[in-house]
């Protein structure tokens, strides 16, 4: 018997990396998974294959989370297929562009805000209203970053959005506590994902970055997935408003413990 039997989870950005790994871990625990992607349909279909190989069912949907109507359509399709959604993982995001504020275009700033903040808002609002309609307990898991606390020059737009996600999580936790909706936040550090490898292409630079991590290694996407299982299951029913750094001790080493 799995920890997520009879649950339906919707994970944005589940075509690769953390989202894909979490979809697989959820499926292993019995959850049906709504797999979403923006442009990588092949990756999303690969996630579906792995979800089915784990013995569960999935649904692949393309969505632009910055568009409110597309988010509404995504939820409508999910409900049409599975009749309910019990778990929302806000994971779809864009990375920092390595541009200092003085040189940053409004477009770069807006792209980060629309995806990393508005996307979370649109999905969360729709999810809350669906949970109220269907009844029962529910879980919201937001994915931020260690850069919610650790500043990185050249990524102001990214750091600002991740700080927003953390405080969004805390406010939601207080607003929804009496409704049986738990809201928590995962703050990944260096995780071996395609997105991070693309952001830092130089292997020597990545090797140097690892040396600043107390555990002296990067994390694996499935490690995030296993934490997400805890936050999505009844094991975490008395946990809300918390941030969980998954960073090998990086935030603690910089005096930035959550």
Question: Regions from the language model: what does each represent?
Answer:
Residues 102, 150-156, 178, 216, ...:
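Active-site loop immediately N-terminal to the catalytic Tyr-X3-Lys motif
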Residues 99-101, 105-113, 209:
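Substrate-binding pocket helix/loop in short-chain dehydrogenase/reductase
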Residues 145:
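Residue(s) in the substrate-gating loop at a strand-loop-helix junction
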Residues 8, 15-17:
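Conserved glycine-rich cofactor-binding loop
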Residues 124, 161, 169:
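Active-site helix of classical SDR
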Residues 129, 174-178, 237:
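Alpha-helical segment proximal to the catalytic Tyr-Lys
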Residues 98, 229, 240-258:
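Short C-terminal tail/terminal secondary-structure segment
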